Amino acid sequence: MSSLLVDNIGELVTNAGAGDGPLGIRRNAAVLVEDGLVAWVGPNRYPPPADRRIDAEGAAVLPGFVDSHAHLVFAGDRAAEFAARMAGEPYTGGGIRTTVGATRAATDDELRATVRRLRGEALRQGTTTVEIKSGYGLTVPDETRSLRLAAEVSEETTFLGAHLVPAEYADRPDDYVGLVCGPMLAAAAPHARWIDVFCERGAFDADHTRAILTCGQAAGLGARLHANQLGPGPGVQLGVELGAASVDHCTHLTDADVDALAGAGGATVATLLPGAEFSTRSPYPDARRLLDAGVTVALATDCNPGSSYTSSMPFCIALAVREMRMSPTEAVWAATAGGAAALRRTDVGQLTPGARADLMILDAPSHLHLAYRPGVPLIRQVLHNGVPQCRP
């Protein structure tokens, strides 16, 4: 059994009840890691012996970020589309087809290189758990290989065959839904933990969304969905009704939507993706409204080549505080424990005995600096499963 002690921690965010406030903060603390798990958390003056030691030098230590919404399997980029939006063209989601064409044409090695590059990029910024969706293949073999490549770097894989109706089915959306619920789901399910649907105008309506999610649940996949990004719609309430783990975007909400999420009691998380609003110059979700209603909120990057090409959870924290009226403490919780809740995980997003030893050491004395110093590389060191991964 190997052991590692991280000591001289000035501020330890545990996300557990034993510490102070909603982040369970402990001062002058230490963490013992054994065989990839947190074995002990306690005061720095009484640390247990360990084989190795990392001196945090009085800095803040946090659980690794849990990015519960990302699209990392794709080819090409859409920089020209971004420039056009910044010049005033509206975002409608149609650029997804551009990425579908490039992804279908790419080799496995080309897609693998992109996935690994973005996964490494995220890890260097403190993300130790990332959900990865398919959705840029939209054929049985392309969706299956997307999930297979995603599974090489993450245990959280999501089948998003219902990202958009591809061009070859434009006049036959019912036939495409049949393909998604039939051969595509059968091929994808062994490689996925979740099923997702883009429930928006121009993509999939409520009836199609219900049919696809219900088929996925019958195949043993957990449900989650994109909802209410481009305008008000049925997605949020449908997600709550079907017991989805998370409804994502939540930009345009009615009072009934908020009430439904609050009534879910945390079983359905509202995952907010401020990188998308930043990159599309769109109105941000009202996180304050959700939090004040008692809704469980997560933050994620929505990393994708079209509407949110960022892998940075610290950037999303800063946006959430500046643009969505979250406090720094709320944003950090949403980016760690909130993301874990959106994935229905209890082994990540916290630093408590038995949890996975995923943590980051900041080049800062407090978690507040993640929002206070936007754009600054504050992640000094990352541990994943108790193993030091990178030291920028």
From Swiss-Prot:
Q: Which EC number applies?
A: 3.5.2.7
- Cofactor binding remark: Binds 1 zinc or iron ion per subunit.
Biological process terms in GO annotation:
L-histidine catabolic process to glutamate and formamide; L-histidine catabolic process to glutamate and formate
Gene3D superfamilies named among the record's database cross-references: Metal-dependent hydrolases, Urease, subunit C, domain 1
Q: Where Zn(2+) is bound, by residue?
A: H69, H71, H226, D302
Q: What is this protein called?
A: Imidazolonepropionase
Does Zinc count among this protein's keywords? yes
Q: What's the stated role of this polypeptide?
A: Catalyzes the hydrolytic cleavage of the carbon-nitrogen bond in imidazolone-5-propanoate to yield N-formimidoyl-L-glutamate. It is the third step in the universal histidine degradation pathway.
Q: Which family does it belong to?
A: Belongs to the metallo-dependent hydrolases superfamily. HutI family.
Enumerate the residues binding N-formimidoyl-L-glutamate: Y136, N304, G306
**Protein's UniProt keywords contain Iron:** yes
> What UniProt keywords apply to this chain's record, in alphabetical order?
Cytoplasm, Histidine metabolism, Hydrolase, Iron, Metal-binding, Zinc
